[in-house]
Amino acid sequence: MVNKIKGFTLIELMVVVAIIAILAAIAYPSYQEYIRRTKRVEMQTTLQQIAMQVQRYKIANFKVIGATSSDLNIATSYPIQGTPLYTVNLTPVTARALNAETWVLTATPIANTSQSGDGDIVLNYRGERCWTKGTDINSGTACVPSTTSNWDGK
């Protein structure tokens, strides 16, 4: 009788390890970009919530000019729980049409975080929004929201 040896050869195991390494090299950067995009969308949602708070404050106090973060009951870094990834800045703008008070919210990624270099997210009083892809576009300054701009970067 012939006795057959069962099992895998070293070459077969090396091929499997190589395939797993290639898949991991492709999947990990994709996963990181997915997480980055998810955090950006969370911040966009948070900006919309902050915009509602600003509007509530404006209705109650008839102005936004001079309001502080504590007056508006908003934090300066988000997310509030966990590691902050963005700083939020409310910029009141005066002397617009009919002397109406207007504002712009800008979320800027904090350096040395997972969102670092992801670009500014901007929302204004009209609900117009934009996102600057990366830090090198517009010389590192935020985009200007318009009726044709969007958060998807297109």
Kindly give the residue locations of the regions a language model identified.
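Extracellular/periplasmic head regions of type IV pilus-like filament subunits
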Residues: 63-128
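N-terminal single-pass transmembrane signal-anchor helix
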Residues: 1-34
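Low-complexity, S/T/G/P-rich flexible repeat/linker segments used as non-globular hinges
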Residues: 120-154
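Alpha-helix exit/C-cap motif
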Residues: 37-41, 52-71
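Membrane-proximal amphipathic alpha-helices
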Residues: 32, 36-47
